[in-house]
Amino acid sequence: MKVLILQGSPRANGSTAWMAEQCKKAAEAAGHDVTLVNVARKKIAGCLACEYCHGKGNGACIQKDDMQELYPLMAEADALVLAVPIYYFTLAAQLQAPIQRMYCVNKPAKVHKMALLMSSYSPGVYAGAMAEYHDICNYWGVEDCGIVTAKNDEQKTDETRQKIADLVAKF
């Protein structure tokens, strides 16, 4: 199975990056073909709502930025993992842009499983991101394989590593 992990934290050595790396290791150990992309390091603009993609573009976005690298990866992925820090109640902007740019293709062609990894230093801030994630799963018609959250002292622990491995086992 091809697994695509979109990591949305600008902090290269932060908790979200660690969670994404643990997911990659667990998925590779399970025999999956894994691609990990730090979308926070990419130049991906938000959707312009210009509708070029649904007219002359025939499914292609008019914007020629780093999202062009992600479209083929999304098209080939069987499973998609979103790894994101929660700064203020919802998915971080760095991950919002690539998700919303999928508008031009409507839904990823092969993705049938999804998972969400979230980190935060504040308790009680995950509900908005969880609701958005569940909406994406429902709209795309994909199986929700689970959510792993890690706050404060839960970050970068063996317990969190095991929760991520258990989530990957659902792929």
Task: List the model feature ranges, each with a label.
Residues 1-83, 89-104, 154-171:
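N-terminal beta1-alpha1-beta2 submodule of the flavodoxin-like/Rossmannoid cofactor-binding fold
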Residues 8, 39, 118-121, 149-150:
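Cofactor-binding loop segments of dinucleotide-utilizing enzymes, especially the Rossmann-like FAD-
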Residues 33-38, 142-150:
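Short beta-strand elements in bilobed, periplasmic/extracellular small-molecule ligand-binding domains
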Residues 83-84, 129:
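A general marker of short, structured functional hotspots
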Residues 86-88, 121-122:
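Short glycine-rich anion-binding loops that position phosphate/pyrophosphate groups of nucleotides
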Residues 106-147:
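Short, glycine-/small-residue-rich phosphate/pyrophosphate-handling segment
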